[in-house]
Amino acid sequence: MNKNEALNLVYENILGEHSILIQLRRGEGLNEDRFNELVTAMQFLIVEYKDLDIVPKKLALSFVDISNYFYFNEDKYSLEEQNLIEDAVQKISQLANELFDYW
C-alpha cells in the first residue's frame, strides 16, 4: 500500500457515496471487510504522517466529528450489531486521535 492508496481508501470508506457510514444508515450493517480495509489504511497513514505537522485537508475533514455520524436510529440493529458498530466507532476514533496526535 502506498500513501495515495491509503488516502483513497479512507476517502471512499468515510466520505464516499457507498461509505461505511452510508451503509450503516441504510441498515446494511457493518461491512467488516471495508472496516478492516479502513483500519489498515489509517494505520499506514499514522506511520506516514507521524513526523509531519501537516496532513491533507480532505483527510482531516474525513474525521471531523466522525463519532457523530455513527449515531442514528438504533432500531435498525440488534444489540449485538449495535455493540459491534460501537466498537468500530471507538477503533476509528482511537486511530484518528493517533493520526492527528501532535505531541
Report the location of each language-model feature.
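Secondary-structure edge/capping motif, primarily at the C-terminal ends of alpha-helices
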Residues: 17, 21-27, 49, 73-77, ...
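Short acidic/histidine-centered micro-motifs embedded in hydrophobic/aromatic stretches
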Residues: 13, 27, 58, 62, ...
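Charge-rich, solvent-exposed alpha-helical interaction surfaces
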Residues: 6-9, 23, 41-44, 62, ...
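Mature extracytoplasmic domains of secretory-pathway proteins
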Residues: 32-52
